[in-house]
Amino acid sequence: NNRIEINKINSDMISLEKQISDVAEGLKDVVTKSELADMMNSFVSDDDEKWLMFNAKFSSADEVYETIYKQAKSSIYVVDNYIGLRTLVHLKNSPTGVAIILFSDNVGNNKLHNIEFTDFCKEYPTVNLSMKKTGGIFHDRFIVLDYGTADERVFLCGASSKDAGARITSIVEDYGVSKYAPVIATLLKNPTLILPQ
């Protein structure tokens, strides 16, 4: 009986060691107080650089969006009701041949206008970009790469890409991609977004 109990305790200790090892590994990506203080100070500095938190790391906002978009293999879907020229500029280096759909109702001040969109398309003719309405039901913003494929990825975005880094915000990858399928399927049926002149 003692031998069985000793074996069970031994097994429990091995399991506990594994859990502690996993926690220690996860702590490598945790932001320290000093890193967070540096980030907060950058939001109130006169520096032009825009910063955000990306998967618990302090990063340049523009670089984060461009890095995410460059990973796409077949499609990029951006859901963001507050769009502007900066939203488009983040997409300029997307891989050639990737279909990009921007889902938006284009609300708020500083809306994207047709002239800006037309000029962008002329300057970056290899960017395959179209727009659809969101239908007034979205608050959150997110990016979906390679929808409906084995490579599908979803990123939740705290702020609109046109304002990213202006205030404290973050982008995180959500690994539960299947829950977004009905949302994206609905969005794909929405009408084309017509931009104001």
Sequence positions of predicted segments:
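Catalytic histidine site
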Residues: I76
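PLD/PLD-like phosphodiesterase catalytic module centered on the HKD motif
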Residues: N1-D62, I83-Q197
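Secondary-structure "cap/kink" motif recognition
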Residues: I68-K73
